[in-house]
Amino acid sequence: MRHQCRVPLLGRPADQRKALLRGLTTQLIREGRVTTTKARAKALRDEAERMITLAKNGSLASRRRVLGYVYDKQLVHALFDKAPTRYGDRNGGYTRITRTVPRRGDNAEMAIIELV
């Protein structure tokens, strides 16, 4: 039984949710930090940490998995070059989520997710 084994749905169909997380992950790897809602930041954390762990592994299969997920090809190659030196001694916990002020329009809880 799959009781309480849920992914964050984010109020979207599966295809839109996957595209949203792919876009946020690409942006986080490119910029180093992203301001988004708290729920999206928590969902993004899992995906971003998975991509960095694959980049630390450095195998061809890992590179192909990340190339299939991240939108920018040059960004993937840069990630695979920098991740082993930047996160080599760290086992997980590559991101930090910091809460910020609520969004003005709908009072949604906002957060900044950044790479450590």
Curated annotation (Swiss-Prot):
Keyword annotations of the record: Ribonucleoprotein, Ribosomal protein
GO terms under biological process: translation
One Pfam family named in its UniProt record: Ribosomal_L17
Domain of life of the native organism: Bacteria
GO molecular function, one term: structural constituent of ribosome
GO cellular component, as recorded: cytosolic large ribosomal subunit
Family: Belongs to the bacterial ribosomal protein bL17 family.
Oligomeric form and interacting partners: Part of the 50S ribosomal subunit. Contacts protein L32.
Protein name: Large ribosomal subunit protein bL17
Record organism: Synechococcus sp. (strain CC9311)
